[in-house]
Amino acid sequence: MKTNIQICLVLLFFSTMASCSRLDMIGMISGTSPTIDERFEQSQQYNTEHGFATLHAPADNYHVYVCTDTHINGTRKRWEEFVDAYRADDVCPVAVHLGDIIDAKTDFNYVKEPLLSPSPKDTLMAVCGNHDIYFKQWKNFIAAFKTSTYYFVVKTPSGARDLFVVYDSADGTVGSKQLQWLENTLQWASKQGFRHIIGCTHTHLFKRDGSQGHTSNFTIEETYALLDLLSKYGVEMVWSGHDHVREITQVRGMKCIVVDSMKDEDKEPYYMLVTMGKYVNYEFVAVE
């Protein structure tokens, strides 16, 4: 009887994991060291030395291109299409990748190669996802993108300023140190007269379909703590990925958007095209 129960539990575990089609089990089990607090401290060291970026939009109504979960591993066709699209857009000052940039042990330099050709618009803001730290790949992520906890400001010709706050949720928690930084940053931001405040992270606040099994999801307690904090200080939207399936939830005046995945193997991949103006509008663009 005991053996049968053990077999059932093992089968249940692997059936749950199978729903994440390219989840690398070895990478997940081997750990995602360092911890979130350690990753935060390393990110803050970079931020202290280099500061936070202010970008200049070419128009008061400008575009931000947003993708997630490319899981690049050997091919990067759709990633290259995304890069070409935002670079060709005359009113796009920045693009955001919401994490799970790579899959397994892919070199981040392979991801960055399409960004190396000369272009006035090569500003990519990266979010750290769970696959980006599997196999202890944090050191490679930080070498490529420098920090996983930061903010950047986009300033328009008329002087309007939009704030984008990026926080690390790669292993399903923001940790105590980053949570305090997030509160301090949002408290400061609420007094600065920003036109819009947007949160960018990998793990979504609300998990409805269970497609990612037990990988990197917030506890209920942390979900409510983040929801209270973000809504308290006027965050208008939170953009995230991880679930591979689009989902839009409106709660406490804040819109939480899970963006579709954009893997080369996906049957219906999309990225999100956001128009930042008096209002924030968005649409989802199919990728070939």
Regions from the language model: what does each represent?
Residues 53-65, 151-165, 193-196, 250-256, ...:
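Beta-strand-turn-beta hairpins that frame and shape the catalytic cleft
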Residues 1-8:
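Bacterial N-terminal signal peptides that target proteins for export
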Residues 23-45, 187, 246-288:
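Binuclear metal-dependent phosphoesterase catalytic core
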Residues 16-19:
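C-terminal motif of bacterial Sec signal peptides marking the signal peptidase cleavage site
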